[in-house]
Amino acid sequence: MKKHILSLLSVLLPMVVFADAVEIDGIYYNLVPSTKEAEVTINPNVYTGDVVIPASVTCDGVDFSVTSIGSYSFFNCKSLTSISIPNSVTKIGDMAFSYCNSLSSIRISDIAAWCSIIFSGMESNPLSSGGKFYLNDEEIKDLTIPNRVTSIGQFAFTNCKSLSSVTIPDGVTSIGGNTFSYCSNLTSITIPNSVTSIGQFAFTDCNSLTSVIIPDGITIIEFGLFTRCSSLTSVTIPNSVTKIGDSAFYGCSSLTTVTLPDGVSSIGKSAFSNCSGLTSIAIPDGVSELGEMAFMYCSNLASIKIPDGVTKLGESTFHGCSSLITIVIPNGVTVLEYGVFSQCRSLTSATIGGSVKTIKKNSFTDCPALADVYCLAENVPSTDLYAFDSYILQAILHVPSNAVDAYMAQEPWRFFQCIVPLDDESIETTYYTSPTGHIDIYSIDGKLIGTAAVQSEAARIINNLPSGTSTIVKKGGKSVKIMVK
């Protein structure tokens, strides 16, 4: 389908050249007499080889400044190998350099002028081809933005593969969206405190970037700002930040710890999803909502404290947090959304707050280690039949003493192996290892009082016998005497 669309565009695009387009030295232009400006446009015969766009052209004795490159101007010019763009160009239209597969050299003479170009999209920038970027015939690797620059436009350096370091001077106040996205060899960047705005996806896929200090004055970590910066190990977030946007740190797999300032009140969808190296993060007390998939697949996150002020956990917020051991859901939460703790395979204990009224499908599925669920709600929450799975047959449910009968009467709660009052402290849970079979539990006088099936070489024995009672546990042919403390 993509090939058919590309073929169709290749046929149609030459037809959209304006009737008054003129050819001057092999380049086609749309001329605007009223402003004496010229726009580079489509060549019906396609551009090939090395193209040098001049700063001005003359037609019928009138000089025109070349200020823009029109949409699709070099679209599908597969034999275009080099492009030189003058300082006079201030705008490049949509898809201007799409499918320029052989474009290996992009040449400019002024970084400040380049920073001010308005790019309509990623493929309006010739750097999207992956070619080398030259400033006055020298390949750009260590970039220093000139002091006279106050704003770096969106897409300005996207996909600049040669870029290894960037120094931004005081005086720059904004960095546009996607400005440095896909700069795969960028290892360091210095951002001054004068910067108060950094656009969405500005550093997406900068997978060699190891550390970054976000300047004071930034209030929002925007959507996708550091998505898939897989080498990022350190990020400093200033106290001015109040919001962590959607996918802000998605896929930052080398990030081990993050300190969020106290002023943060919102953590967006997938904000830290797939941060597989993250071991700890402190959520500020002012946060009221954790977005969908906010910590999904943070596979090394062993513990996390959800503040009391949180009232909403999004779908799959902690899905796949396979190292998480315990979780306490605060009383302000009323709904456990779909898959919120699914595939938390090390989770042994979960406390559900007293205000929870609804527990949706897969909330705790594939949590095979979950041994104790503490549900503080006196009114049995409306619970999907598949909120839990078969492990609850071996798990203890702890509920308010006045609600035990109600939980026993409702699915899926009644499927728990044991439902006990929260204030019953006589419950003892003991683990014994055994390769196969099951464990038999006998009273001291030899009466069989229970069994426990062995799963994954471990069996869980539950009793609520009075303190001081002795029992005998048989594992195969061996007997072990134990006492309830």
Predicted features by range, described:
Residues 444-479:
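Short, surface-exposed loop/turn motifs with a glycine/proline- and acidic-biased composition
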